A protein has these predicted regions:
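Active-site-proximal, Lys/Arg-enriched surface segment
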Residues: 58-116
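Short secondary-structure transition/capping motifs
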Residues: 33, 50, 67-71, 100, ...
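Short N-terminal secondary-structure initiator segments
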Residues: 50-74, 233-245
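Single, function-defining residue in the core of a domain
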Residues: 1-38, 77, 89-92, 115-329
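Short secondary-structure boundary/capping segments within folded domains
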Residues: 33-36, 51-53, 83-86, 100-101, ...
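A structured, charge-rich N-terminal accessory region that forms the first stable segment of a protein
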Residues: 22-59, 63-65
Length: 329
């Protein structure tokens, strides 16, 4: 009870400039989510505190999910809660990745702060299937993320191989650094060697000791080509031979795990060991997604039948508040 009281005091202090009734309902829904453990309209309504009949509680949550003012100020809510946490950090390592969301019609783009243990969600953006990985949504996401975290001494955006040079260019334009994995058929111009190399050719040079290739030009013909510093690393086998949880039809996942890392960093001050250490933490965002989706240990995200971007976005906001409360505890 004391931990819950302290969490509420933190949230109320952070959200003092926002609408009091909406703030109260948001915190009440966060509590209900923690007790009910299902990110659905009916479960949250059933576990709301108070003497009202269950049907009225569910209607209250329904009205909350379609509140257009709350949807418009969600960036301000993320900012108000996150700012006190990141204010005194010397640098920010932020993992960004896509995930499926409730149904196959919607997807989530999430930014998570990489720390010791579980990462902390900073911002969620829900989009429809047609906008998955679109450049416009990437630009909007980075713009809103910039509003949330504000000015900071050093910011590293950590991404996997699905984010290509257009993304790098967007991040660099904000004055941030990228730490990411380079994959696919891309060619890189290695300044030290004075020649273009395919990633497969670079894989041969990788070992269990992180090594740098120096400055390189990413992509040969793309208009968004950019410069970065490349690092090689091939981790030791995990000793799971013959115990894969994947079927023979999904060899792709096994090959991805065995493939050496070609990591890129736009910060020349980072050495290979530091780049590998930062990138290794990227898997924390996958744990973040599992915390929301797991039907046994998480918020059972898949049970939600909400079917608009606005309603799902507010459900994600409720999950964010619930996760933050559990993280504090």
């Amino acid at each position: 009870m004391l931990a819950k009281l302290l969490c509420h005091k933190f949230f109320q202090k952070s959200l003092t400039h926002l609408h009091k009734a909406r703030t109260k309902t948001l915190l009440d829904c966060g509590d209900a989510l923690i007790h009910g453990n299902k990110l659905t309209l009916t479960s949250i309504g059933r576990h709301l505190h108070g003497s009202a009949h269950v049907k009225h509680k569910i209607k209250r949550v329904d009205r909350f999910l379609k509140n257009k003012y709350l949807y418009q100020e969600q960036v301000e809510i993320y900012k108000a809660i996150i700012q006190p946490i990141i204010a005194n950090l010397s640098y920010l390592a932020i993992a960004i990745d896509w995930s499926g969301c409730c149904t196959h019609k919607y997807h989530l783009l999430r930014a998570s702060l990489l720390v010791d243990g579980r990462s902390i969600t900073i911002f969620n953006m829900v989009v429809e299937q047609n906008d998955l990985e679109s450049r416009d949504k990437h630009s909007l996401f980075l713009k809103q993320l910039n509003q949330i975290i504000g000015e900071h001494q050093r910011i590293y955006i950590v991404t996997d191989g699905g984010f290509l040079t257009p993304w790098y260019s967007e991040v660099i334009s904000l004055g941030w650094h990228v730490v990411g994995r380079v994959r696919g058929t891309m060619k890189c111009y290695i300044e030290k060697k004075g020649q273009w190399k395919t990633l497969k050719e670079l894989h041969v040079e990788a070992s269990t000791t992180p090594a740098t290739l120096g400055k390189a030009r990413l992509t040969q013909h793309s208009p968004t080509a950019c410069d970065a510093y490349l690092h090689l690393y091939h981790g030791e086998a995990k000793g799971r031979k013959g115990k894969s949880r994947f079927t023979k039809d999904t060899k792709m996942y096994q090959n991805l795990a065995k493939e050496p890392w070609v990591l890129s960093s736009t910060d020349e001050m980072l050495n290979s060991e530091q780049v590998v250490k930062i990138y290794m933490k990227r898997t924390q965002i996958e744990q973040n997604f599992r915390d929301d989706k797991s039907q046994r240990y998480g918020f059972s995200w898949r049970f939600s039948q909400s079917n608009t971007v606005e309603r799902i976005s507010i459900l994600c906001l409720i999950a964010f508040v619930g996760s933050m409360a559990l993280w504090f505890i």
